[in-house]
UniProtKB/Swiss-Prot annotation:
CDD domains: Ribosomal_L29_HIP. Belongs to the universal ribosomal protein uL29 family. This is Large ribosomal subunit protein uL29. Gene3D superfamilies: 1.10.287.310. One of its GO terms (cellular component) is cytosolic large ribosomal subunit. The keyword Ribonucleoprotein applies. SUPFAM superfamilies: Ribosomal protein L29 (L29p) (SSF46561). It comes from Stenotrophomonas maltophilia (strain R551-3). It holds the Pfam family Ribosomal_L29. One of its GO terms (molecular function) is structural constituent of ribosome. Keywords: Ribonucleoprotein, Ribosomal protein. GO terms for biological process: translation.
Length: 61
């Protein structure tokens, strides 16, 4: 998701999105461990998106 669209969301929406990203991160990690992850770049993508959301949440306080 682009930073522009993330900035338009409220803090509650960002928190909900963060929870979804954490679930996705867990799923991607489990796929990696079991050898079922065809796109290894998904790990990095999810990690960076989590960082973006957490940065925005910290700046809105």
């Amino acid at each position: 998701m682009e930073l522009k669209t993330l900035r338009e969301k409220s803090a509650d929406e960002l928190k909900a999105h963060l929870i979804d990203l954490r679930k996705e991160q867990f799923s991607v990690r489990m796929q990696q461990v079991t050898g079922q992850l065809p796109k290894t770049h998904d790990i990095r993508r999810v990690r960076r998106e989590i960082a973006r959301v957490k940065t925005l949440l910290g700046s809105t306080k």
